[in-house]
Amino acid sequence: MDPNKFREKEISKKEALELFEDNEIIFELFKFADSLRREEVGDIVTYVVNRNINFTNICVGNCRFCAFRANENDKHAYFLDIDEIAKRAVEAKKFGCTEVCIQGGLHPKIDTYYQAEILKAVHEATKPYGDIHIHAFSPMEVYFGAENAGLDIKEALKILKENGLNSMPGTAAEILDDDIRAELCPNKIKTKEWIYIIKEAHKLGIPTTATMMYGHIEEYKHWVNHLFIIKEIQEETNGFTEFVPLSFMHKYAPIYKEGKAKAGATGIEDLKVFAVSRIIFKGLIKNIQASWVKLGKKMVQVALRCGANDVGGTLIEESISRSAGAEHGVYMSVEEIRDMIKRVGLIPKERTTLYKILE
């Protein structure tokens, strides 16, 4: 199949599946995705200066890919109080961050009102320094908080927005297929609940990212269905700011240790995800992020020539990928990020969470 035909023609699910399965045309595919990237966003590659605040690892969930969670009485369990979260946000602001990404495990005492207190405290603490964008709470956290507070999803999202939620990570998507989810994350929200929460957030004017975690127990057909669900949501709401493929970190994941999951995706599969998603999301989601935490510097540089146009954040403290066995560090300086981009002939630019260029 010649990928170039998708310059004019919309790709079907069947054709997307063929592109994932065909190893004879990978270089044509990557070259075509790179040309689409150039048409949509030019040669600018963006990054955000941000800090991740994972405020607790205590979690009642039982996701079988997660090596981050702890029970309340585990030795390594921790829970940052609201003052500590606010203090870290102020440190981030003083450091030059424009965003804090706040997420945590599903701690039994957390509800929507507690999440709202976190938002309020962070905005109040950072206001004297010019305030900070809060990117927080996955659809799973929103669902869990609402349930604990006895609220419906709409009410919960309204409260979070009123208290300063600026945008949401579209994590907890993993693979949007209930058979896969039953095996991978049995306690997590179902596909239709994830879709509903994302759409409600978009309707309220809360932009979100979209993600896909791949390389574990799923097949290519699941990737295709997942990507088309995201495409259909974007056609309806236009609320996704970016798509972030998340390559499965297998090393310490329980499901891998039990011998039930692959050892992550191959390098070629990683690159195919960038390329095919660039084709599927043509004209809909123009920002596709290659995560250096998951892929490492060199692989990100290749991804930037296969459809990706963003490298994510400086991410001071990325404890979730680290506990899963990511080997690429938890912080990259702005100088390193810019150098990584420049060395593949592209132009680095700092952006905000919502993709406003800052230079």
From Swiss-Prot:
EC number annotated for this UniProt entry: 2.5.1.147
Note describing how the cofactor binds: Binds 1 [4Fe-4S] cluster. The cluster is coordinated with 3 cysteines and an exchangeable S-adenosyl-L-methionine.
InterPro entries in UniProt: Aldolase_TIM (IPR013785), CofH/MnqC-like_C (IPR045567), CofH_family (IPR019940), Elp3/MiaA/NifB-like_rSAM (IPR006638), F420 (IPR034405), FO_synthase_su2 (IPR020050), rSAM (IPR007197)
Listed cofactors: [4Fe-4S] cluster
CDD domains xrefs: Radical_SAM (cd01335)
Keywords, alphabetical: 4Fe-4S, Iron, Iron-sulfur, Metal-binding, S-adenosyl-L-methionine, Transferase
Chemical reaction(s) catalysed: 5-amino-6-(D-ribitylamino)uracil + L-tyrosine + S-adenosyl-L-methionine = 5-amino-5-(4-hydroxybenzyl)-6-(D-ribitylimino)-5,6-dihydrouracil + 2-iminoacetate + 5'-deoxyadenosine + L-methionine + H(+)
Sites where the protein binds [4Fe-4S] cluster: 59, 63, 66
Enzyme class: transferase
Alphabetized GO MF terms: 4 iron, 4 sulfur cluster binding; 5-amino-6-(D-ribitylamino)uracil--L-tyrosine 4-hydroxyphenyl transferase activity; 7,8-didemethyl-8-hydroxy-5-deazariboflavin synthase activity; iron ion binding
Pfam name, any one: Radical_SAM
Radical SAM core domain segment(s): 45-278
Pathway noted in the entry: Cofactor biosynthesis; coenzyme F0 biosynthesis
NCBIfam families: CofH family radical SAM protein, F420_cofH, PRK07360.1
Similarity-based family: Belongs to the radical SAM superfamily. CofH family.
The protein's role, per its UniProt record: Catalyzes the radical-mediated synthesis of 5-amino-5-(4-hydroxybenzyl)-6-(D-ribitylimino)-5,6-dihydrouracil from 5-amino-6-(D-ribitylamino)uracil and L-tyrosine.
Subunit text: Consists of two subunits, CofG and CofH.
Record's protein name: 5-amino-6-(D-ribitylamino)uracil--L-tyrosine 4-hydroxyphenyl transferase
Species name: Methanocaldococcus jannaschii (strain ATCC 43067 / DSM 2661 / JAL-1 / JCM 10045 / NBRC 100440)
